[in-house]
Curated annotation (Swiss-Prot):
Keywords on record: NAD, Oxidoreductase
Gene that this polypeptide is encoded by: slcC
Amino-acid positions noted as binding NAD(+) in the UniProt annotation, renumbered to this chain: 151-152, 171, 231-233, 257, 281-284
Keyword Glycoprotein applies: no
Cited PROSITE patterns: D_2_HYDROXYACID_DH_2 (PS00670), D_2_HYDROXYACID_DH_3 (PS00671)
InterPro entries associated with the record: D-2-hydroxyacid_DH, D-isomer_2_OHA_DH_cat_dom, D-isomer_DH_CS, D-isomer_DH_NAD-bd, NAD(P)-bd_dom_sf
Entry protein name: (S)-sulfolactate dehydrogenase
EC numbers, comma separated: 1.1.1.310
Species, as recorded: Chromohalobacter salexigens (strain ATCC BAA-138 / DSM 3043 / CIP 106854 / NCIMB 13768 / 1H11)
PANTHER family noted in UniProt: D-ISOMER SPECIFIC 2-HYDROXYACID DEHYDROGENASE FAMILY PROTEIN (AFU_ORTHOLOGUE AFUA_6G10090)
Active-site annotation: 233, 262, 281 (proton donor)
Family indicated by similarity: Belongs to the D-isomer specific 2-hydroxyacid dehydrogenase family.
Gene3D superfamilies found in the cross-reference section: NAD(P)-binding Rossmann-like Domain (3.40.50.720)
Task performed by this protein: Dehydrogenase of the (R,S)-sulfolactate degradation pathway that only acts on the (S)-enantiomer of 3-sulfolactate. Together with ComC, provides a racemase system that converts (2S)-3-sulfolactate to (2R)-3-sulfolactate, which is degraded further by (2R)-sulfolactate sulfo-lyase. Specific for NAD. Also able to form sulfolactate from sulfopyruvate.
Length: 309
């Protein structure tokens, strides 16, 4: 039996450091073997996961000694937070650990999609020379719209402003008198932001209130030729409506790192859609961020278990 069970990949140096204070089982294959995971709960006081391990009531019932769930990241939709609270189990996200990675990912997507030239390698190597078709747009002076204005969005806003972008944000949970609005235009209505922004980036959790927040009506409201980038959670965007908007060329492009079903299947509604860049839920995952969130999580777990921090 181990004090700590780790079911997904994690920085090995951080794991080794945790082993100085706790007995640890580190098995990144457990996420793909639910039965084996559920049979591994005896004596485990802390479980460390990423976004694929489902921490639900079924799992909690098989981990009777569990006191903490360390989340290697910030999204909590794979964790039944209410069930954990009822059992007095601490849920410990690695807040701030992947902020830089996500912000850089979003800005890269904006540059790639607005300029339009970076994915031309096959055509150029085939002898085409489509200079006029790939002329694209500069990003300086463009307006970035942020849906949600938490820590990652605020860091992204600062970086975008340094590049000469105008930034506006919509977040009904940030009071109008919050100091965060001093440097960013506040859009009271989501529709106002969608109408004005040249690029829209999503930074909200998935909930009943945000499921399909960006639906067909919202996409139609967006500025013609604008971009949509989703690094938040699949389900916030209606993928069928997005595919239609891209095919109709109302949107200028989209970059999705998260999807309603992961991984995608060959018959996805997004298959064959031009103007789309798709990545496998990796916006927040770099070598540097993996180290940061691993060490943050190790410290969080140590504190929760009352050992050296």
């Amino acid at each position: 039996m181990s004090d700590v069970l780790i079911s997904e990949f994690m920085d090995e140096a951080a794991v080794a450091d945790l082993e100085r204070d706790c007995s640890v089982t580190f098995d990144a294959t457990l996420v793909d073997d639910r039965a084996r995971l559920l049979s591994s709960g005896a004596g485990v006081r802390a479980l460390i996961v990423r976004n694929r391990t489902r921490v639900d009531r079924e799992l909690l019932a098989r981990f009777p000694d569990l006191r903490a769930v360390g989340r290697l990241g910030v999204g909590l939709d794979n964790i039944d937070v209410d069930a954990c609270r009822e059992s007095d189990i601490a849920v410990l996200p690695a807040t701030g650990g992947n902020t830089v990675s996500v912000a850089e990912y979003v800005l890269t997507g904006i540059f790639m999609l607005r300029r339009g030239a970076y994915l031309s390698t096959p055509r150029v190597l085939a002898g085409e020379w489509p200079r006029q078709a790939l002329m694209g747009h500069e990003t300086q002076g463009a307006t970035l719209g942020l849906v949600g204005f938490g820590g990652i969005a605020r860091d992204l806003a600062r970086r975008a402003q340094c590049l000469g972008m105008q930034v506006m944000a919509h977040d009904p949970f940030v009071p109008a008198d919050d100091a965060a609005w001093q440097t960013v235009e506040r859009a009271e209505r989501l529709a106002t932001l969608l109408e004005k922004a040249d690029a829209v980036s999503l930074h909200v959790p998935l909930s009943e209130g945000t499921r399909h927040l960006i639906d067909g009506e919202a996409l139609a409201t967006m500025k013609p030729g604008s971009l949509l980038i989703n690094t938040a959670r699949g389900g916030i965007v209606d993928e069928r409506a997005l595919a239609a908007s891209l095919r109709d060329r109302h949107l200028g492009g989209a970059m999705l790192d998260v999807f309603e079903e992961e991984p995608l299947t060959a018959d996805s509604v997004l298959s064959g859609v031009e103007g789309l860049i798709a990545t496998p839920h990796i916006a927040g995952v770099t070598h540097e961020s993996n180290e940061r969130i691993s060490w943050i999580t190790v410290d969080n777990v140590r504190r929760a278990l009352g050992v050296r921090a």
